[in-house]
Amino acid sequence: NPLPAIHPQPQEVTLSTNRMKAPHGFTLSGMQHPDDDAMRLIRQTLSITDNSEALPLKITSLEDRTPELKRSGAYLLVITPEEIDIAISDSRGLFYAAQTLQQLAQTDGQGNTTLPLGVIKDYPDVAYRGTVEGFYGDPWSHTDRIEQLRFYGKMKMNTYIYGPKDDPYHSSPNWRKPYPEKEAAQIKDLVKEAAANKVDFVWAIHPGLDIKWTDEDRMNVLNKFGMMYDLGVRSF
C-alpha cells in the first residue's frame, strides 16, 4: 500500500513501506496517567489490552529537548516491528501524536491494524493556529461549530476565537447581559468540545456600537468576562 498522507505535514518524516502489526494488541507503559482525550483517540485506532503477548506502546516525556521540542504540541513518534514509542512535550503533544497514528493506520486482509515503520518528529512553527468566527454572513449553527472544533483538533490547530456578529450577547445590544439558559448551555458545550480537541476557546466581546467610555461600562465588561468564566471560558 502507498504511504498515507499526513495532514498537516510533520516537520520530519521517515517512513518505510514495511508495516508492523500487533494481532494481540498493545499494552501501555511509561507515563502513569496519559491524557484522556488523546487516549480516546488511541483506543479508537489501536487495541489496548493487558494480553501478555501484546506489543508495548510506550508514552514518555521528551528528554534532551531542542527549543522546538519544548513547544506545546511537540512529539516524537517511533514505530518499530516490536513496539510504538511516543515521547511528548505535553498532553497536546500526545493528542497530536494520536491524530497522526489515526492517519497512519490501515487494516490488512485479516482485519489487523497495521502501521508503517518509521520516525516522525513534529512541533508547531507558530504558537497560535486557528480561526476567528467573526464574519457578518450566514451564521454557523451550533452543530457547525462543534464540527469545526473537531476539525481543528484533527488539523492540530489550537485556537478558536468566538465572535459571530449575529450573537447579540457578544455584541450590541446585549453584551452587558448574561446569556439566556439555552445559549449559555451551548457556550458550555463549545468550551467542553474545544478542550477535548486541545483547542483554546477564546470568547471575544464586541461592544463598540454602544459602549460608554466610563467606569460603569468598564465594570460591565469585566462583569461579562466573569459571567463567561462561570460558563467555563478561560481565554478572552
Labelled PLM ranges:
Residues 1-92, 100, 104-121:
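Acidic, contiguous N-terminal accessory segments
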